[in-house]
Swiss-Prot record:
EC number: 1.8.4.12
Annotated source species: Clostridium perfringens (strain 13 / Type A)
GO MF annotations in UniProt: peptide-methionine (R)-S-oxide reductase activity
Protein name: Peptide methionine sulfoxide reductase MsrB
Cellular compartments per GO CC: cytoplasm
Keyword Oxidoreductase in record: yes
Length: 147
């Protein structure tokens, strides 16, 4: 599947205000009220702006932070990490590679048995593709992750 980056004007037409704010303006949605923080479906999470596969439900865990938390991305090459010194803190921001969408942040306080990382990701930056729909939506190669 080929993924393409959309222009800002096109994104304004297809994303909700919150999705645009989070992905394009480096925003953060409210904790505990977003779509995927407590969601347990089996499938993959893709960049809402490009469709790039980012995370799998197999790597999702409950962290009590109020946002979806993952131990790792599907492939580290599809994300970018950069230093974020906003809000008086030093954190590591996570962005999608192609879309350059703000996804959230990665922290070193994840479960040790899962590698020790916690990717704290905004639901508004993600679209969930259920395992049952991976083939029809063009993500058939990711079915292997669920065997």
């Amino acid at each position: 599947m080929k993924y393409t980056k959309k222009e800002k004007e096109e994104l304004k037409k297809v994303l909700t205000e919150e999705e645009y704010y989070v992905t394009q303006e480096n925003g953060t949605e409210r904790p505990f009220t977003n779509e995927y923080w407590d969601f347990n479906g089996e499938g993959i999470y893709v960049d809402i702006t490009t469709g790039e596969p980012l995370f799998t439900s197999k790597d999702k865990f409950h962290s009590s932070c109020g946002w979806p938390a993952f131990s790792k991305p599907i492939d580290r090459s599809i994300i970018k990490e950069k230093v974020d010194k906003s809000h008086g803190m030093i954190r590591t921001e996570v962005r999608s590679k192609l879309g350059d969408s703000h996804l959230g942040h990665v922290f070193c306080d994840g479960p040790e048995e899962l590698g020790g990382l916690r990717y704290c990701i905004n639901s508004a930056s993600l679209k969930f593709i259920p395992k049952e729909e991976l083939k029809e939506k063009g993500y058939e190669e990711y079915l292997e992750l669920f065997k």
